[in-house]
Amino acid sequence: MYKIMTAGPTQVRENVRMARSLECTNPDLDMEFFDFYHETCAMLSKVTNTENKALILGGEGILGLEAACASLTEPGDRVLVIDNGIFGKGFADFVKIYGGQPVLYTADYHNPIAVAELEAFLKTDHDFKYATVVHCDTPSGVCNDVEEISKLLDKYGIMTVADTVAALFGEPLDLSNSKIDILCGGSQKALSVPPGLTMLWVSDRAFEAMANRRTPIASFYANILLFKDYYENKFFPYTMPISDIKGLRVGLENYFADQTIHERHAKIAAATRKALTAGGIKLYLASGWANTVTVLEVPEGVTDRQILRSMEEDYGIMISGCFDVLAGKVVRIGHMGENCYVEQVVPTLQALQGTLEKLGIPVACDLAKTFLTEMGK
């Protein structure tokens, strides 16, 4: 087994693994499970400080992105796709699948969305049913201010769908200070629960838009509206993955018990960037670094596969490459959730330094030592 230091999925704590092995009831029929699910959703609402309805869907985080688009999009709807990263641009595919007309607002992939520049665009064109935006676009590691972006969109009467799969639990997010209508999360990133669950936070306005559609939602599994009154009706649209939800519940308990989780993510991310920069390793981003992942450019003269292979074979540590327009250009270190501890990052930096030097790439400092010095400040 490798030490998993990827940009997600992440390492999983033993108590989460144990919770997923507990005896199961029938989640379709046992009324106690409806209470368990409902209470777990209430914990999710507490994470984001919201009265918006929290839901858990059976499916990896991408399900939430598609479900949001499936449930809101009608044929011909214009949808603003805020694109400053691979996942940001990817929302356009979901919009098109359900008959919408995606309009891309494309910005520099090396920086977060500039709210003032987005507003300048909206002044010229704001006829959109909703907009999509990514909180942390993991391929580049950029972190967008989705709270402020959603408030700007609301000013122009535009609903917001936000993907926080790779940010939430590592980055603070206050839905009460936003106008986000559907927030999409996943289990396998900073919460450090195995992949398999989508979490959604849905506003009344979004539910009203779904209920008042001219055409039926063109999906069953991705139909969020079917979940709206699950507790009152004691009915789920499909059988809930009970073992996954038991693991999620313990993951949430771990999160609430960790009083320094956001501070630690921010500090470890900053120290990681400082060490890499001091070592002469170029970061992909110019600004807007997320607290959950650090993305570095592949040095000239080597390939991403050489770096990844050496990390795995020589040190037993798995980090991430990338795909799409960043394929072969960057590698990524995930320091989120259970990965976000000094004792996890230090051997990762030591392995990276050993790998680069083995491949003939000089490193200007001791990465691990520089990281520890920064952590001690």
Give the residues covered by each predicted segment:
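Conserved beta-loop-alpha segment that forms the PLP phosphate-binding cup at the N-terminus of a helix
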Residues: E51-L80, N84, G88-A92
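Active-site phosphate-binding strand-loop segment of PLP-dependent enzymes
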Residues: I113-T164, F169, I182, A190
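Conserved PLP-binding catalytic core of the aspartate aminotransferase-like
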Residues: K282-D314
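Conserved PLP-dependent catalytic core of the aminotransferase class-I/II
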Residues: E39-V47, L252-Y284, R309-S310
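PLP-dependent enzyme catalytic core of the Aspartate aminotransferase-like
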Residues: K329-K377
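A glycine-/small-polar-enriched, mobile loop at the entrance of the PLP active site in fold-type I
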Residues: Y2-G58, I62
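Conserved active-site segment immediately N-terminal to the catalytic lysine
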Residues: S176-Q188
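Active-site C-terminal subdomain of aminotransferase-like
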Residues: Q11-V12, Q188-K274
